[in-house]
Swiss-Prot record:
Pfam families: Gemini_AL3 (PF01407). GO terms for biological process: viral process. Disulfide bonds: none annotated. It comes from the Viruses. This is Replication enhancer protein. Increases viral DNA accumulation. Enhances infectivity and symptom expression. The lineage of its organism: Viruses, Monodnaviria, Shotokuvirae, Cressdnaviricota, Repensiviricetes. Homooligomer. Interacts with the replication-associated protein (REP). Interacts with host proliferating cell nuclear antigen (PCNA). Interacts with host retinoblastoma-related protein 1 (RBR1), and may thereby deregulate the host cell cycle. Oligomerization and interaction with PCNA are necessary for optimal replication enhancement. Keywords: Host-virus interaction. Belongs to the geminiviridae replication enhancer protein family. InterPro entries: Gemini_AL3.
Length: 134
């Protein structure tokens, strides 16, 4: 849903994309929180954010696009290593498709978390998307 207007994102907006070779560094990955074994459980809680680059947002007609993911996993790898492998796998998936769009980024994250990484228990996705009005 568009945060600015409250309207649902149309299929055309979600699937319109840009070729991967046209834009360098289209996505920015950051880990916002890492809770190691909260409440003495055997799970780790990772919260990370994917931001769309200025050139990608300009090409797609987006004013702001933050995709926030909260992951429950039993992986015990260091945070930096997890982010580096995750980022590499997402870019690899997007390069195989050849087009970067909102739907393709979400599909890439889903593929990496549930097919590439093992021991992913649950993922909650929140987004902050604002399309250009003009």
């Amino acid at each position: 849903m568009d945060l600015r207007t409250g309207e649902y994102i149309t299929a055309h907006q979600a699937t319109s994309g840009v070729y991967t070779f046209e834009i360098t560094n289209p996505l920015y990955f950051t880990i916002t929180r890492h809770n190691q074994q909260p409440f003495n459980s055997k799970y780790n809680l990772l919260t990370f954010q994917i931001r769309f680059n200025h050139n990608l947002r300009k090409a797609l007609g987006i004013h702001k696009c933050f995709l926030n993911f909260r992951i429950w996993t039993t992986l015990q790898s260091p945070t930096g290593h997890f982010l580096r492998v995750f980022r590499f796998q997402v870019y690899k998936y997007l390069n195989n498709i050849g087009v970067i769009s909102l739907n393709n980024v979400i599909r890439a994250v889903d593929y990496v978390l549930f097919d590439v990484f093992e021991n992913t228990i649950d993922v909650i996705e929140q987004h902050e998307i604002k399309y250009n009005l003009y």
